[in-house]
Amino acid sequence: MAKRHLTRRQSWRIEKIQEERAARAARRELRAVDELEGGDLGPEQTGQVIAHFGVQVEVESADGQVSRCHLRANLPALVTGDQVVWRAGNQGIGVIVAQLPRRSELCRPDMRGLLKPVAANVDRIVIVFAPRPEPHANLIDRYLIAAEHAGIQPLLLLNKADLVDESNAEGIDALLNVYRTLGYPLIEVSAFNGLAMDELRGALDGHVSVFVGQSGVGKSSLVNALLPGVDTRVGDLSTVTGKGTHTTTTARLFHFPGGGDLIDSPGIREFGLGHVSRDDVEAGFIEFRDLLGHCRFRDCKHDREPGCALLQALEDGRIMPQRMASYRHILASMPETDY
């Protein structure tokens, strides 16, 4: 079926209806909070947001008890992984009264281009890709830039390693060698047959991790393999496009038996970088770092300028051609105002 193209007026009407519905839901929540705070609430205690449902969240207390909570109107936007102060209610529903400072946050632009946090207090971003759908270095590099920009340690994870065969082995090996050469940690696993899953468990224990990657690469299947008994609605590849169908709808936090947490967030096909500048993109390519600032011209675009340190490193073999091509492709996709 062809994609429906909306007129500007139709898009405006849809957006207005959604805003009105959100406003009504917010008013209902405010009334609920007022009623709770007018009654008996327990003492303040700390907890962690383990799931977000729009106007309500699930909070886990220090003793492992999970409660549904309303949000005070003056709170900033909360995301899964946030540490909060909350008060329990006598009807089983509590109230979030404060957000504690974040150690880190992972953000990406929403459909309007506005920066939106998607997970908090993460210290490892696991970039999942697979032989099918076909992996692209450009998308992996976008995730790496986001991780470097946020100061979060990346881990590259090739899932569905059992699908590597004669038809794709050469391309997969070449892709993996690029990132191994750069020094990024990389694990090849299969949630299907259990290949190297113990190695992955060891890499995740003791960390707060988030899985990112295209739909169809098996993020939900990995969660099911790592945490038996947890159902995260696994979807199949689209037979028409070969891309994954979106399955996981709500970011959730899970605990590993040996310590550490996993935040499983919705799959995305394209990861925008509208919130980073050209300088941020350059810094996200770790092999560029020692070269930046050493070009002949301060405003060097690293294209054809004489005395460019990056072009010289490319010629000398210190920068791989495919990485330079990916860098240029990412810059070309950014708004010109960010140059």
Curated annotation (Swiss-Prot):
Keywords: Cytoplasm, GTP-binding, Hydrolase, Metal-binding, Nucleotide-binding, Ribosome biogenesis, RNA-binding, rRNA-binding, Zinc. GO terms for cellular component: cytoplasm. It is found in: Cytoplasm. Its EC number is 3.6.1.-. Residues 111-271 form the CP-type G domain. It comes from the Bacteria. Monomer. Associates with 30S ribosomal subunit, binds 16S rRNA. NCBIfam families: PRK12288.1 (NF008931), ribosome small subunit-dependent GTPase A (TIGR00157). This is Small ribosomal subunit biogenesis GTPase RsgA. It comes from Pseudomonas aeruginosa (strain UCBPP-PA14).
